[in-house]
């Protein structure tokens, strides 16, 4: 496959990205290890926040902006934590039952947050693993502020009219309808469904204004990404496009410190993966 070059819209690095053959999970930044999917989500959030071509680490601090993200991975979460009122949560039933860490653990099928609490909710490759996904979408709609947006990626085929249901969840126990499929969480997280276009209709019925974007932004080495946006309002407002002249951030002596922060955050992710795999 031909090399892919561009600028990372998360850390600002410019150059040739590696593993372009891995599609959604590849085209990785050599500086911060963001994938094409990470950059696609950051790109959409940047468009919603009117940040243009600025990489995430140059976005202004706004602690009045409250963001909820499930199973956050990649380099952007540590930057979001510095800039916004950011809830990066994991699904851990034992921790959720304790109720001691509401900013770190949550069940999207039964969120413990107040109504109209968040400006943005992000779930990247999460909802194919949520047992009762419609409950989750309704909960997110409830906790979004009016005009707030839900940004989601899932394995999605826009050509498919109907979602493929892999597991019957109508009873207390899962009943497999197809060969079990696992990925994420060290390869131990069950996939309940493979989404088709009826997902958009479901979100619309709940009340969202819905948009589906097939994203290809060569300037940021974003390739073949489907992003779904649900806004708690009358319409989805996107977007400004990519300026011809990209930002040229000055990394300077702060680069080692930034890389340390990214490493520190991702250690938390690795620990969670290990615990999840052990529990399974």
For each feature predicted by the language model, list its residue ranges.
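Membrane-proximal basic amphipathic "stem/tether" segments
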Residues: 1, 241-280
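N-terminal juxtadomain amphipathic helix
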Residues: 1-63
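S-adenosyl-L-methionine-dependent methyltransferase catalytic module, highlighting the catalytic core
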Residues: 2-6, 131-145, 149-251, 270
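Short beta-turn/strand-loop junction motif enriched in small, turn-promoting residues
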Residues: 13-16, 75, 216
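A local structural micro-motif
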Residues: 16, 87, 210-211
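Aromatic-residue hotspot detector
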Residues: 17-20, 24, 118, 206-208, ...
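Conserved SAM-binding loop
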Residues: 58-171, 197-203, 227-232
């Amino acid at each position: 496959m031909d090399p892919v070059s561009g600028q990372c819209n998360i850390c600002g690095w410019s150059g040739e990205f590696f593993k372009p053959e891995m599609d959604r999970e590849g085209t990785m930044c050599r500086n911060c290890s963001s994938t094409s999917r990470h950059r696609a989500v950051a790109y959409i959030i940047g468009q919603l926040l009117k940040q243009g071509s600025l990489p995430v680490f140059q976005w202004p601090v706004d602690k009045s902006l409250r963001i909820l993200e499930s199973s956050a991975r990649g380099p952007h979460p540590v930057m979001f934590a510095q800039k916004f009122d950011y809830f990066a949560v994991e699904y851990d039933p034992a921790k959720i039952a304790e109720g001691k860490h509401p900013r770190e653990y949550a069940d999207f099928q039964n969120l413990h947050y107040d109504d109209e609490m968040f400006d943005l909710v992000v779930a990247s490759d999460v909802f194919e693993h949520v047992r009762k996904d419609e409950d989750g979408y309704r909960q997110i709609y409830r906790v979004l502020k009016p005009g707030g947006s839900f940004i989601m990626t899932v394995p999605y085929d826009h050509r498919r009219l109907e979602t493929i249901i892999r597991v019957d969840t109508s009873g207390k126990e899962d009943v497999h309808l197809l060969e079990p499929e696992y990925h994420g969480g060290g390869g131990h997280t069950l996939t309940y469904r493979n989404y088709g276009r009826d997902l958009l209709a479901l979100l619309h019925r709940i009340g969202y204004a819905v948009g589906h974007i097939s994203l290809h932004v060569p300037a940021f080495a974003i390739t073949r990404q489907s992003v779904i946006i649900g806004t708690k309002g009358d319409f989805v407002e996107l977007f400004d496009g990519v300026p011809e002249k990209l930002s040229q951030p000055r990394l300077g002596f702060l680069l080692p410190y930034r890389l340390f922060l990214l490493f520190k955050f991702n250690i938390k992710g690795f620990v969670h993966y290990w615990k999840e795999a052990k529990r399974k």
